[in-house]
């Protein structure tokens, strides 16, 4: 519970290169652990968009269309959610960078 997807799969990009866990290793270890292999920045600059484009090019989280239902001789309008012909928004640039969820840093206010 509380494990991120990459950590659960065994891919921990911010793991320490030193495998020891003794008292001497604790003093020598830095506050921010350097990643093994490729350099992974601790910040996130983009995210996947949660909105969709419809056929007309409108952008929204959900789309509805109005349908007319006749019941007992009375016409009544109902809204039906549209699921077809929607295009995902794609990658969205964030206004200000966020800290990566897998980066092991404790934030506190002084």
From Swiss-Prot:
Strong expression in heart, lung, skeletal muscle, kidney, and pancreas, followed by brain and liver, lowest levels in placenta. The keyword Nucleus does not apply. The modification Phosphoserine is found at residue 50. It comes from the Eukaryota. A lipid is attached at residue 2 (N-myristoyl glycine). One of its GO terms (biological process) is natural killer cell differentiation. The keyword Transport does not apply. One of its GO terms (cellular component) is mitochondrion. Pfam families: TUSC2. Coiled coil: none annotated. Myristoylation is required for tumor suppressor activity. Keywords: Cell cycle, Lipoprotein, Myristate, Phosphoprotein, Tumor suppressor. Belongs to the TUSC2 family. May function as a tumor suppressor, inhibiting colony formation, causing G1 arrest and ultimately inducing apoptosis in homozygous 3p21.3 120-kb region-deficient cells. This is Tumor suppressor candidate 2. It comes from Homo sapiens. The lineage of its organism: Eukaryota, Metazoa, Chordata, Craniata, Vertebrata.
